[in-house]
A protein has these predicted regions:
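Metal-dependent nuclease catalytic cores that hydrolyze phosphodiester bonds in DNA/RNA
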Residues: 1-116
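Mg2+/Mn2+-dependent nuclease catalytic core
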Residues: 103-171
């Protein structure tokens, strides 16, 4: 996949420049618009200091687990520290169901949707081509909580099909 130039617009949002010169907002920015209100309400409820502490800790854990998943799928050493070992071991069996990787941390863009970003993984999961996005959470979520995840993975499925001609059937 071609590299995309990644910049930040004046509002601090990620923008990707495609090989044709088009500038598209990130998939995460676009799908995050639906959760901004909920995050603002949560921040008001717990207070900014506590929200910053929780967000920072969750973001760091998510980055570490994401890196472990990527390394594991590349066949590289993936040794979690003591803090991440339990979470990583709870998802490792799912990683073993991933095969025939088409994209792993690769840039994708859609001229049709006018969005771009870096997809976590597109591969066969249990035998079906899937967009796989590594998420971490300290609590179970129901479908209403993850609507934006479906939008995000759907956008990557469209972008992947535009770039390769291969449809992705599972998100």
């Amino acid at each position: 996949f071609p590299k995309l130039e990644r910049t930040t617009n004046p509002d601090g949002k990620r923008v990707y420049k495609t090989p044709s010169g088009a500038a598209y907002p990130s998939v995460t920015t676009v799908t995050g618009l639906h959760t901004a209100k909920g995050i603002a309400e949560w921040r008001a409820r717990v207070g900014n200091e506590e929200a910053n502490r929780i967000s920072s800790r969750a973001s760091a854990r998510g980055t570490r687990i994401h890196s472990l998943c990527e390394s594991y799928l590349r066949g590289e050493s993936a040794e979690p520290d003591i803090f991440d070992a339990e979470m990583f071991s709870s998802i490792k069996f799912l990683l073993n169901d991933i095969d025939n990787i088409h994209a792993l941390e690769d840039p994708l863009y859609s001229d049709h949707l006018q969005v771009a970003g870096t997809v976590d993984c597109i591969a066969e999961f249990q035998g079906k081509l899937s967009v796989i996005d590594f998420k971490t959470s300290s609590r179970p979520k129901d479908r209403d909580d993850i609507h934006n995840y479906f939008m995000q993975t759907s956008a990557y499925a469209v972008a992947f099909e535009e770039r390769t001609g291969i449809p992705v059937g599972r998100m």
